[in-house]
């Protein structure tokens, strides 16, 4: 058993390190550490979502593929004509990219799969816990959230909510970073009120329904 624990622990450590690295990359992206990179991701995401709001997903994918092919085919023809006029033999303009190894390694695939599987298992465990009412208060919170979502869904469609989500994701961190002290103060007040109300509700519940002490 001691021999097998070493590779497993190292694999888990590498997965955790990968998760931390990806988390830092997302954080830097949302906090606009690199304005050019964040702007490209934000702009590209918004263009895609706005396109999906106006056209069907099949049309959007078709237009994207046609746009990409228009660029690559035009560049390929341009370089071929240029080589014919200048009588040069530079070869295929995309040869370095065609010869580049873009295959996904088994190690990278296994790391990504292990990381994704851990998140999926955690989500499944939380879903089962909520739907089977392990904690009544948490299940009631989910019911209240879903009830509110019915009203939100009646006003906004899925694409509109995604657009609003992207806007909030790329603007809220900047606002929070600028007004961190004030926001933390009000969040603390709200958290205290919610905690107080939750404790009052739990105190009135029968013993079998109260949250199990950890």
Swiss-Prot record:
Q: Domain Reticulon, which positions?
A: 26-214
Top-level division of the source organism's lineage: Eukaryota
Q: Does the keyword Nucleotide-binding apply?
A: no
Q: Which UniProt keywords apply?
A: Endoplasmic reticulum, ER-Golgi transport, Golgi apparatus, Membrane, Transmembrane, Transmembrane helix, Transport
Q: Region annotation Disordered: residue ranges?
A: 1-22
GO CC terms for this protein? endoplasmic reticulum; endoplasmic reticulum membrane; Golgi apparatus; Golgi membrane; neuron projection; postsynaptic density
Q: What sections of the protein cross the membrane?
A: 46-66, 150-170
Q: How does it sit in the membrane?
A: Multi-pass membrane protein
Query: Which locations, inside or outside the cell, does it occupy?
Result: Endoplasmic reticulum membrane; Golgi apparatus membrane
Give a yes or no for keyword Acyltransferase in this entry: no
Q: A Gene Ontology biological process annotation?
A: vesicle-mediated transport
Instruction: State the protein's purpose.
Output: May be involved in membrane trafficking in the early secretory pathway.
Assembly and binders: Homodimer.
Query: This chain belongs to which protein, by name?
Result: Reticulon-3-B
User: Upper lineage ranks?
Assistant: Eukaryota, Metazoa, Chordata, Craniata, Vertebrata
Encoding gene (name): rtn3-b
